[in-house]
C-alpha cells in the first residue's frame, strides 16, 4: 500500500511552483519513486516537487528533506519547495530561524524582510565542470559549446552552466517567449553533455537589477517557477558582469529576489510561500504500489 497512504499533506506553492509537503518525522519511512509518481497521477495531487520531511540526522537541524520530481526522480535542491517547508515549520514552532539537511547540504531559512516572505540560504554555487557535472572538460563554464539548430544559424547557443546543488544551463535571449522551450527543453535536459540531466533556462537581462526567465525543469517539465534556476541565472549573469549581485527575477509565476552574497559566496533567495489546502492521501492512489 505504501508509506503515504492515509497520510496528511499540505498543498502549497512558491510563485506558482506546485509543491506538496509531507511530514514523516513521526513515522520514519522511505518514499519510493513509484509512490512519488502515484501522488501526481490522475486523481492524486498535482505537483512539480514533493517535499518529504524525515527525522533529522544532524544536531541543530529540523529535518532531512527528501525532494522528488513528479516523474519520481529525486532532486538535490528546490528553493521554492524549501520556502514552503520553512513556512510550515515556522508556523508550527514559532522559531526565528531554521536549518534543514538536504542531499545538497545544509540550508538555512529565516523570515523575510516583509510578512509572507521567506529567505533560504541556498549555499555557494559551483562552476567546475566536474561539479556541475558535465560529460567533458570545459575550462570556462561562463559559456560552453552547445547549440540548438543549424551550425551556421543556431536558434539557441552558448549557455552558461552552474550548479546550485543541481545542474543548470542558461541560454541568454532577447525574448524568453520567442523560443519553443516546451520542444527544446526535454532535448537539452537529456543532452549527453549533462550526465545527470539538467534544468534548462531561457533568460533575458532587462537591466543590471532585473532578469526575466523561463525554465524547463529536470524531471518536472515546464513549471511556473524554479527557485534554484533563478539562483543559477542570477549568479551566471553577475559572473558575466552583466548584472549586479542583488537582482529581481521575473518568472511566469511571480518574482524572487536573489542575492549572491560577496562575503561568503552564498546565494540567498527571498520570496513568498502560499498555503493552498491540507488533505489526506487516498489509499487508492497507492493500490498498485508494492
From Swiss-Prot:
Keywords: Amino-acid biosynthesis, Cytoplasm, Isomerase, Lysine biosynthesis. It is an enzyme of class 5 (isomerase). Pathway: Amino-acid biosynthesis; L-lysine biosynthesis via DAP pathway; DL-2,6-diaminopimelate from LL-2,6-diaminopimelate: step 1/1. Transmembrane segments: none annotated. The record marks 168, 217 as: Could be important to modulate the pK values of the two catalytic cysteine residues. PROSITE patterns: DAP_EPIMERASE. GO terms for molecular function: diaminopimelate epimerase activity. Substrate binds at residues 17, 49, 69, 79-80, 166, 199, 217-218, 227-228. Belongs to the diaminopimelate epimerase family. This is Diaminopimelate epimerase. It comes from Nitrobacter hamburgensis (strain DSM 10229 / NCIMB 13809 / X14). The gene is dapF.
